[in-house]
């Protein structure tokens, strides 16, 4: 096993412990608490994958951090903080919308890289909007916290979330997963649009109809689907 992978996990466990102490003292805001819950699931998944005990890893991570802090001067710390780019946390959804339980009559689940796509295939002929909570850096989507698909009535009919066992994903991973979700929902004649905030930071553009631009791969797949539908209609006639 790569020692850097182990030490990274150990430090992440200790830093999560510190953040949990902050939350316990009621010093964290909503985005802080949201990330804390998500990261806890991620750490459990990583610990299981690596075969490492979280409590033991937390103790070792504390030793690593203490050693680094002892060696680093205050001036070096100030320079590091000044040069580090700051990320922003953007929210389309309220805490209630993010934490609400939902159920699927005809569940479908697909893994798209490090992301899990879930949708209810029983939903038909609905107007659906995709909302997401995510962090942004350099005006680009950095990390997806959670994306959900809502009908006009407010029902949740789809979701994209990071896989705890595969931490880390790119902007392209998110766009590909959104393409999978849109394709699945539109198969049942639903009309899907993406929130303006998500369009802006994932695709750096926005369309009035709420549709993000398709990638060449998605365009080819859609063309194949249309040709298949045309052939079936001709055979039926």
From Swiss-Prot:
Where does it primarily localize?
host cell
Its keywords, alphabetically, are: Eukaryotic host gene expression shutoff by virus, Host cytoplasm, Host gene expression shutoff by virus, Host mRNA suppression by virus, Host nucleus, Host-virus interaction, Inhibition of host innate immune response by virus, Inhibition of host interferon signaling pathway by virus, Inhibition of host PKR by virus, Inhibition of host pre-mRNA processing by virus, Inhibition of host RIG-I by virus, Inhibition of host RLR pathway by virus, Interferon antiviral system evasion, RNA-binding, Ubl conjugation, Viral immunoevasion
Look up keyword Iron-sulfur and say if it applies: no
Localization in the cell: Host nucleus; Host cytoplasm
What are the start and end residues of every segment in region (Disordered)? 205-237
Database matches in InterPro entries: NS1 (IPR004208), NS1A (IPR000256), NS1A_effect_dom-like_sf (IPR038064), uS15_NS1_RNA-bd_sf (IPR009068)
Task: Quote the Pfam families the UniProt record gives.
Answer: Flu_NS1
Q: Where is this motif: Nuclear export signal?
A: 137-146
A GO biological process this protein is involved in?
symbiont-mediated suppression of host mRNA processing
In terms of superkingdom, the source organism counts as: Viruses
**Which portions of the chain have biased composition (kind: Basic and acidic residues)?**
226-237
UniProt-annotated stretches for the region RNA-binding and homodimerization: 1-73
From the UniProt entry, list the residue stretches annotated as the region CPSF4-binding.
180-215
Q: Which residue numbers does the motif Nuclear localization signal cover? A: 34-38
Q: How is it modified after translation?
A: Upon interferon induction, ISGylated via host HERC5; this results in the impairment of NS1 interaction with RNA targets due to its inability to form homodimers and to interact with host EIF2AK2/PKR.
What's a GO cellular component annotated to this UniProt protein? Answer: host cell cytoplasm
Tell me the SUPFAM superfamilies matching this sequence.
Ns1 effector domain-like, S15/NS1 RNA-binding domain
* Ranges for region PABPN1-binding: 223-230
| One GO MF term attached to the UniProt entry | RNA binding
Keyword RNA-binding listed: yes
Function of the molecule: Inhibits post-transcriptional processing of cellular pre-mRNA, by binding and inhibiting two cellular proteins that are required for the 3'-end processing of cellular pre-mRNAs: the 30 kDa cleavage and polyadenylation specificity factor/CPSF4 and the poly(A)-binding protein 2/PABPN1. In turn, unprocessed 3' end pre-mRNAs accumulate in the host nucleus and are no longer exported to the cytoplasm. Cellular protein synthesis is thereby shut off very early after virus infection.
Domain characteristics, as noted in the entry: The dsRNA-binding region is required for suppression of RNA silencing.
HAMAP family per UniProt: INFV_NS1
Subunit field text: Homodimer. Interacts with host TRIM25 (via coiled coil); this interaction specifically inhibits TRIM25 multimerization and TRIM25-mediated RIGI CARD ubiquitination. Interacts with human EIF2AK2/PKR, CPSF4, IVNS1ABP and PABPN1.
Q: Which family does it belong to?
A: Belongs to the influenza A viruses NS1 family.
Indicate what this protein is called per its UniProt record: Non-structural protein 1
| Species in which this protein is naturally found | Influenza A virus (strain A/India/6263/1980 H1N1)
